[in-house]
Amino acid sequence: MTKSVKKNIKNEISIIVANLALSKNIKLDKININIQKPPKSDLGDISILIFELSKTLELPIATISEEIIKTLKSKYEIKAMGPYLNIKIPRKEYINNTIQMVNAQKDSYGTSKYLDNKKIILEFSSPNTNKPLHVGHLRNDAIGESLSRILKAVGAKITKINLINDRGVHICKSMLAYKKFGNCITPEKAFKKGDHLIGEFYVEYNKYSQENENAEKEIQDLLLKWEQKDKNTIELWEKLNKWAIEGIKETYKTTNISFDKIYLESEIFEIGKNVVLEGLEKGFCYKREDGAICIDLPSDSDEKAEAKAKQKVLIRSNGTSIYLTQDLGNIAIRTKEFNFDEMIYVVGSEQIQHFKNLFFVSEKLGISKNKQLIHLSHGMVNLIDGKMKSREGNVIDGDNLILELIESIMPEITQKIDNKENAKKNALNIALGAIHYYLLKSAVHKDIVFNKKESLSFTGNSGPYIQYVGARINSILEKYNALSIPIIKKINFELLKHEKEWEIIKIISELEENIIKAAKDLNPSILTNYSYSLAKHFSAYYQEVKVIDINNTDLTAARIEFLKTILQTIKNCMHLLNIPYMLKM
């Protein structure tokens, strides 16, 4: 497999550093060569930060820089600038190397062993069975699915988990409304997906509760019946949950979201109690006079529901558990089942304190020993007039958002595609590209306002624009193949002398480091930015350059291979972002 020029330079500098360390009797466990992009392209193609090496080797920056320059000056143009070494790489070698590497690796181009075999669990989505997925869920799903692909691309072993919340007060609200107003309606009779039908009853309960003081008591009575396994209550619960879960899974299929393991909260929620009782036996928890089992949170906790001593109830005096206790059980289950190294919870920012408390308690009870637990807190997706509230029905529904985008672009697509089914399939792929890209292009922690018009733009920083560029390149390649130009066995990449070709080659060569950075930062927006940059550079290049010239077949062949590397790189990014690649648009 072809090594990149950057890796060769890194290896060469590592040898120089190792020799310098040996001369000073310094033992190095690991040599970290920090390669960066120079602030200006005229300074060089790559930049090496010498400052950290200076501290490690206990040598002046100038001494290390001089040694590297002396050793490598016959191969590269190198200049020292303060704590940096700026290196210009010979274009011929760089272009040849990059194109050959992309052609050889194809779909695996950009992958690495940065997290080689690290076992990581990603928990995301975690919907309630009382409503359909809204656009906030779609953002959570987009982040979780994209990160699973990014982390897999850097060598991690990924397990995607979905914990479906199918029990509790919020589920009983839909059940109560259905009992009162359902009239035996079914999804089939209503011509609706099951999750949409159940969501309507959740909204109906909110209206009912505003007009009836006994609504809360009715909910508690229904919950008690569920806990006592009342036959009629359980049958109703199972029926409504089945409808909701079937509808939610249909949305997952539409949006290309998948899981390795799906848990139902109702099947595992009691396990956390055993974890807490074991903690009580070991003295990590204590029992209050009223029988509640508690633990003390750290002094910096913002928990306000407990006493001043930051006391946290894990099992109530009536024997019921809280949500945190159930999550303790989940950690115990997953440790036993998967023996993971790291578990990442993709959950909105409103749960920051919950996970802070969970991680503290799990460590104190010893159930997360040698395990890294991470809450990847993502921002909210808002309406123009503020935060979504599904209990009021004021929510951007995920399925309906997809349908709205499809309807917006269908008139344009049907002008190009006569077959209605093919047109609808294309429209769906564009809608998914628009949604996933828009939900991923902002940093994970930021709140966003979903703008439908902006998301569908074919000219701006959007999914459809990336899809369009991919389809445009494919069209050029098809046009070239149709010309039946004689195959040139040895392509001369030295003919690629246009400045924009050089700029694009450098961007293509940076895919691996961008994927690694996205994995390190748990931030897919790094790859949306990268994809947009590559697509923009191609568009500018294509406006200036004639790719197919039948009077210059050697240059045409070189440029066609060059376009293949651009397309492969874009396709690899689209896969990592869960954006459908389209041959035609």
Swiss-Prot record:
Residue window of motif 'HIGH' region: 127-137
Protein's name in the database: Arginine--tRNA ligase
Gene Ontology biological process: arginyl-tRNA aminoacylation
Catalytic activity: tRNA(Arg) + L-arginine + ATP = L-arginyl-tRNA(Arg) + AMP + diphosphate
Gene Ontology cellular-component terms listed: cytoplasm
Entry-linked InterPro entries: aa-tRNA-synth_I_CS, Arg-tRNA-ligase, Arg-tRNA-synth_N, Arg-tRNA-synth_N_sf, ArgRS_core, DALR_anticod-bd, Rossmann-like_a/b/a_fold, tRNAsynth_Ia_anticodon-bd
Main location class: cytoplasm
Coiled-coil spans in chain: none
HAMAP family reported for this sequence: Arg_tRNA_synth
Family: Belongs to the class-I aminoacyl-tRNA synthetase family.
Protease keyword on record: no
Keywords: Aminoacyl-tRNA synthetase, ATP-binding, Cytoplasm, Ligase, Nucleotide-binding, Protein biosynthesis
Any one Gene Ontology molecular-function term assigned to this protein's record: arginine-tRNA ligase activity
Chain's gene name: argS
Top-level taxon: Bacteria
Species of provenance: Borrelia garinii subsp. bavariensis (strain ATCC BAA-2496 / DSM 23469 / PBi)
